């Protein structure tokens, strides 16, 4: 059996007689090789019943891509044997059954706007839905699935910035929301907190996902600009408190911190930046699982960091520095205003996604992870992945999500 993965070579000497263990290969190559071997040596009907079948979908897809890319006439390593078309077909069948189902639901006006951003960005491997009490606004949303909630409570006219009305509206359409979320393994609930519909419905939607459907539930929300007033901020903080109690992790992006990134933007443009940050956060988390890359993570990796992660914050960095673009991008992420006044040494976990052009090496991505590891609690759980986007040649982007850290 021979497998090619990212210029690494695995040949028979790497396997023992049972074909179950792999020595002398990278962690990623090890995982893929084990996966392919399992599907050869273990009855498929038995393997499909195991929990691992859910966790390793992205790695199956890697194996498919690898087996396709290898020319059947090539011989790399003495005694290597080509992956047959029969194995390709079996892998395809298993991959189809093992897809991790990821659903993103935008609540209220802000959450629905973020869904539009997700549609434009073409997030790979996620289903999108927008819910709102405002019928006119919902008409402007390009989501594949839209739910007008609270027809009786609001008659399609909005929640009037009253969270209790937003919650009642969601309860009115509970069955439809539940039906949309059914089958999800990961649910992102996104909203701009402070108004009526998003603030009132987000925690209700999250409770369905978490408690009824046992999905890994991640809130991704913004807090209002100071200029939006005291009442809106009070509503937002009350809504955040309810949301964090039902989500595994709640990623919070304070809008005022965005102004430190783009201080000269008018407030309407700043709202669009907030939508963009929300979208990029969910895109990064989704595609680190679903999109083939140099180093992918699977469902269990994400669950390790996000399960009971509490309040979390995001940092974003980018650099094309010729001297040391990795260090520059990571330091920008670590010092991002979006992380706020948190103590990284208290962090329970961190997830790092590194994206670069075709010139990026695994060594660079690994160094990014090492810099973050040295900056946080030594007992924090750190996971990282990296992928290639050819248009980023010369540039490296870093998405950092820190869980469990407390404000200073």
Which residue ranges define each predicted feature?
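Short, basic, low-complexity termini and linkers enriched in Ser/Thr/Gly/Pro
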Residues: 1-3, 8-10, 23, 53, ...
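Aromatic (phenylalanine/tyrosine) cluster motif
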Residues: 4-8, 15, 41, 47
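Periodic, rod-like helical contexts
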Residues: 13, 24-31
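N-terminal polybasic/positive-inside topogenic patches
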Residues: 17, 30-37
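Tubulin/FtsZ superfamily GTPase core signature
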Residues: 22, 36-408
């Amino acid at each position: 059996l021979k497998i090619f993965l990212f210029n690494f070579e695995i040949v028979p000497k790497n396997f023992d007689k049972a074909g179950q263990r792999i020595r002398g290969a990278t962690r990623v190559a090890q995982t893929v090789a084990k996966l392919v071997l399992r599907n050869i040596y273990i009855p498929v009907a038995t393997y499909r019943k195991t929990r691992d079948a859910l966790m390793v979908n992205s790695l199956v897809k890697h194996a498919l891509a690898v087996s396709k890319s290898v020319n059947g006439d090539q011989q790399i390593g003495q005694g290597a044997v080509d992956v047959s078309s029969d194995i390709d077909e079996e892998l395809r069948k298993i991959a189809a059954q093992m897809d991790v189902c990821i659903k993103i639901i935008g609540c209220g006006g802000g959450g629905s706007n973020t869904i539009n951003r997700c549609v434009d960005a073409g997030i790979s491997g996620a289903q999108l839905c927008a819910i709102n009490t405002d019928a006119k606004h919902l008409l402007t949303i390009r989501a594949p699935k839209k739910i007008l909630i609270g027809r009786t409570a609001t008659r399609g006219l909005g929640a009037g910035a009253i969270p209790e009305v937003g919650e009642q509206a969601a309860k009115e359409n509970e069955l439809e929301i539940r039906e949309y979320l059914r089958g999800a393994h990961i649910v992102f609930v996104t909203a701009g907190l402070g108004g009526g519909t998003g603030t009132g419905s987000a925690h209700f939607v999250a409770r369905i996902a978490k408690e009824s459907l046992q999905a890994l539930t991640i809130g991704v929300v913004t807090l209002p600009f100071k200029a939006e007033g005291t009442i809106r901020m009070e509503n937002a903080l009350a809504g955040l408190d309810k949301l964090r109690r039902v989500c595994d992790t709640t990623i919070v992006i304070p809008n005022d911190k965005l102004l430190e990134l783009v201080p000269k933007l008018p407030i309407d443009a700043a709202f669009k930046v907030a939508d963009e940050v929300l979208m990029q956060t969910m895109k990064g988390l989704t595609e680190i699982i679903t999109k083939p890359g140099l180093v992918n993570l699977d469902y269990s990796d994400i669950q390790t960091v996000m399960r009971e992660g509490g309040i979390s914050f995001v940092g974003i960095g980018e650099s094309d520095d010729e001297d040391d673009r990795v260090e520059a991008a990571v330091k920008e992420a670590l010092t991002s205003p979006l992380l706020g006044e948190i103590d990284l040494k208290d962090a329970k976990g961190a997830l790092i996604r590194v994206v670069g052009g075709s010139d990026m090496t695994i060594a660079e991505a690994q160094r990014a992870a090492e810099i973050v590891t040295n900056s946080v609690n030594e007992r924090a759980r750190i996971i990282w992945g990296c992928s290639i986007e050819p248009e980023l040649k010369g540039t490296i982007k870093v998405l950092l999500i820190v869980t469990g850290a407390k404000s200073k």
